[in-house]
């Protein structure tokens, strides 16, 4: 079974991610290393490497592998970076980030999801991930500024606290727009200014919070 999962992961990388143009080697290496099937329910493990999102619990999903890889590559991460993730979900995205950068901070507003993700982090010995239960739209100011911020839920607008917590030269990737239809944006902080790029149409679950969907 281990060989089957490894083969499925290699096929996923080759056919779903590299074939669609993701070339960042740090991202590709992380995708190949992290066992995605550990982040879904046991009954769905054989589907973990398919070209689609999967339901987890509490009405949430684990994103399609390509989207995880694409968003990660847009952050242009280095080994010395600290990253803030908004929306821990299954924990898979945080695990990918942890293989690339120095420290990951992740915030989740659904307690049962966070507890489940923490157990997987511990079992896989991903010790450079720090997590908390909170309103992710507020960010995590204690450890700011961050070299990169990734938001894995759709927001009606870019939350001001997240902009405030981005380091100079930092990058943020976030889905912005109405429910069920957002635009993936990359925000780069340049001094006192923010450069915003519109990249792709996407569909994410809601970012629920004071600075997201109420």
Curated annotation (Swiss-Prot):
Top EC class for this record: transferase
The reaction(s) this protein catalyses: [protein]-L-isoaspartate + S-adenosyl-L-methionine = [protein]-L-isoaspartate alpha-methyl ester + S-adenosyl-L-homocysteine
Active-site residues, as the UniProt record annotates them: 63
GO cellular component, one term: cytoplasm
GO molecular function: protein-L-isoaspartate (D-aspartate) O-methyltransferase activity
Main subcellular localisation: cytoplasm
Compartments in which it is found: Cytoplasm
Listed EC numbers: 2.1.1.77
Swiss-Prot/TrEMBL keywords: Cytoplasm, Methyltransferase, S-adenosyl-L-methionine, Transferase
GO biological process: methylation; protein modification process; protein repair
InterPro entries reported for this sequence: PCMT, SAM-dependent_MTases_sf
SUPFAM superfamilies from the UniProt entry: S-adenosyl-L-methionine-dependent methyltransferases
Pfam families, alphabetized: PCMT (PF01135)
Similarity-based family: Belongs to the methyltransferase superfamily. L-isoaspartyl/D-aspartyl protein methyltransferase family.
Annotated function: Catalyzes the methyl esterification of L-isoaspartyl residues in peptides and proteins that result from spontaneous decomposition of normal L-aspartyl and L-asparaginyl residues. It plays a role in the repair and/or degradation of damaged proteins.
PANTHER family linked: PROTEIN-L-ISOASPARTATE O-METHYLTRANSFERASE, PROTEIN-L-ISOASPARTATE(D-ASPARTATE) O-METHYLTRANSFERASE
UniProt-recorded name of the protein: Protein-L-isoaspartate O-methyltransferase
Organism: Desulfotalea psychrophila (strain LSv54 / DSM 12343)
